A protein has these predicted regions:
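Membrane-proximal transmembrane or re-entrant/amphipathic helices at the cytosolic face
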Residues: 460-518
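Membrane-interface helix-loop junctions in multi-pass transport and translocation proteins
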Residues: 161, 168-202, 206, 381, ...
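N-terminal membrane topogenesis motif
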Residues: 1-29, 50, 91, 220-236, ...
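Alpha-helical transmembrane segments of multi-pass membrane proteins
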Residues: 123-149, 176, 342-370
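Interhelical loop/hinge segments that connect adjacent transmembrane helices in multipass membrane
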Residues: 1-9, 205-243, 301, 431-448
Length: 518
């Protein structure tokens, strides 16, 4: 049963990845259009600074709630059935709306001082624009809160479709505006962001209604599950937003550097986190509820198998992705963004940041897996402490590296802090969970060697193709050819080294789709 469960998790992770990939392709098109319209200048810096402030303060609460509520909802359903679960949904959503409203009012009043913290290098009109955009975008937090609570409810039922699909209308709204507007503005872009955020909840409504869910505003602060949620959510908020806090620190320091440094870090981070937001989120989204249920059943064997499988899958994707981004950082940024207001200078700035963000992709992805393991056991303080450590390390590395390396040093600092704390989390988990550690380490080394072979081959391939790139179209073509061949080389190498997860994943997908076609 355990084997079928984690193989089934691989299949659903793959299926969710397909939908997420469609969404992320649209998201990249959205980013390309944004870069074309605004480039890497003051306006885009103001928008990205305002958005990072909104997400880090208000979005953090929503993200923390989602992670906290999946095991809570599962426990309520187990002990009190569907009716109890639906009743608690109304309670927690009511509290969320109240808290989000209070935070929104406070942020509106304190937007000025907050903007100075976010961008210490900006004064005058630039500062005023950031303040205006923060105030304008505050309703986004309320929409995110509703979305995250609803998403947690559905994920606890192992319903993943709405989560995978919600990015499609979100990106479609952006794309429509950026294509239809004669001259897009950052104020218009913030309005579109609010509308797009609301669409993420609306796409969940059919699935929620099918479970006879009816919302009733109810503030029951004596609810035992609410008390447990409030105790658990604070450390989770801190630990789950470490990446965003680090990025905010990077952007704050980047505001003291050259114009466009903030936008360069933002675009580079978007490219870097594509793998996280598509494949790793898909894996953790599917595995987390299964881990939670396995822990609740005290099934030690299945818990270890699910954990080991998810770690191996994450490594299988992120290690070659990180190596590929390191080798091809310049052509990827050039082809994705260099057009319109996004000139060659912006490409150089952004590709430099991507080069040093890429290694942190591995640490960030593994950290997500490890956090889910702790959350399944409702051990929320450990991720919080390692979160604090990540921020402290990032600040230390920032001040060491910013002078010799500029904005690239900020990116490298983020990567180093993520890698170090993910290693620390691994050593803590190995004392908690019984899993085949030897096999996991051997798999890691095999994947790393496969990735290095792929990286070396990719470097020489691109070097050989460069003289043939006499036009933009040929550059795009050769990049796709290079990436395709690199993937083939990597998969062959993993199969040659006998990495079971490659064969298992392919066999599971083939078997599942084969049944549907039969």
């Amino acid at each position: 049963m355990g084997k079928n469960n984690y193989e089934n998790a691989k299949y659903w992770a793959m299926l969710v990845s397909v939908f997420l990939m469609i969404s992320k392709v649209m998201g990249f098109f959205r980013d390309v259009l944004t870069a074309r319209s605004f480039g890497a200048g003051h306006e885009s810096d103001a928008y990205f600074t305002a958005m990072s402030g909104i997400i880090i303060v208000i979005g953090a609460l929503g993200a923390g709630l989602q992670t906290t509520l999946v095991p809570i909802f599962s426990d309520i359903k187990k002990n009190h059935g569907r009716e109890g679960k639906n009743k608690y949904f109304s309670t927690i959503l009511s509290v969320t709306l109240l808290v989000m409203t209070i935070i929104t009012v406070l942020m509106f009043a304190l937007a000025g001082p907050f903007a100075r913290i976010l961008a210490i290098g900006y004064e005058g009109e630039m500062h005023d624009l950031i303040v205006f955009l923060i105030r304008q975008g505050l309703p986004i937090g309320i929409f995110l809160g509703i979305t995250y609570v609803s998403n947690a409810y559905l994920q606890s039922d192992e319903v993943y479709g709405p989560h995978a699909l919600m990015g499609i209308p979100y990106n479609l709204i952006f794309i429509t505006y950026l294509l239809a507007a004669k001259k897009p503005t950052v104020i218009g872009l913030m309005n579109v962001t609010m509308l797009a955020s609301a669409s993420q909840f609306l796409i969940q409504l059919p699935a929620l209604r099918s479970r006879k869910l009816r919302f009733k505003f109810e503030l029951n602060f004596r609810d035992e599950y609410l008390k447990r949620t409030l105790i658990l959510v604070v450390p989770i908020i801190i630990s789950s937003t470490v990446s965003q806090i680090n990025i905010m620190i990077d952007k704050t320091l980047a505001s003291t550097l050259t114009e466009g440094a903030i936008s360069a870090l933002n675009y580079a981070n978007k490219v870097n986190t594509l793998v996280v937001s598509v494949f790793v989120v898909a894996i953790t989204t599917v595995v987390f509820p299964k881990l939670t249920n396995a822990v609740l059943k005290r099934d030690v064997k299945e818990t270890g198998a699910l954990f080991s499988s998810s770690v191996n899958l994450v490594q299988l994707v992120t290690i070659p992705a990180a190596i590929g981004l390191i080798v091809l950082n310049r052509p990827i940024i050039s082809i994705l963004f260099q057009r319109g207001a996004f000139d060659e200078k912006a490409t150089i700035l952004t590709s430099g940041a991507l080069l040093f963000y890429a290694p942190g992709l591995i640490g960030q992805s593994l950290r997500m897996c490890f956090e889910n393991m702790f959350y399944s056991y409702q051990q929320t303080k450990i991720p919080m402490y390692t979160g604090f450590l990540t921020v402290i390390l990032n600040v230390i590395f920032n001040f060491i590296l910013i002078k010799p390396m500029g904005h690239r040093g900020l990116a490298l600092a983020t990567s180093l802090s993520m890698l170090i704390t993910s290693i620390i989390m691994y050593f803590i988990i190995r004392k908690m969970v019984k899993f085949n550690e030897k096999e996991t380490i051997i798999t890691f080394l095999k994947i790393l060697l496969s990735g290095i072979l792929m990286g070396v081959a990719t470097h020489f391939m691109w070097k050989a193709f460069t003289p043939l790139m006499t036009s933009r179209m040929k550059e795009v073509l050769f990049l796709f050819v290079t990436i395709f061949i690199a993937i083939v080389i990597y998969l062959l190498a993993t199969m040659l080294f006998g990495i079971k997860d490659t064969r298992t994943l392919l066999a599971t997908v083939k078997r599942k789709f084969g049944r549907k076609n039969a």
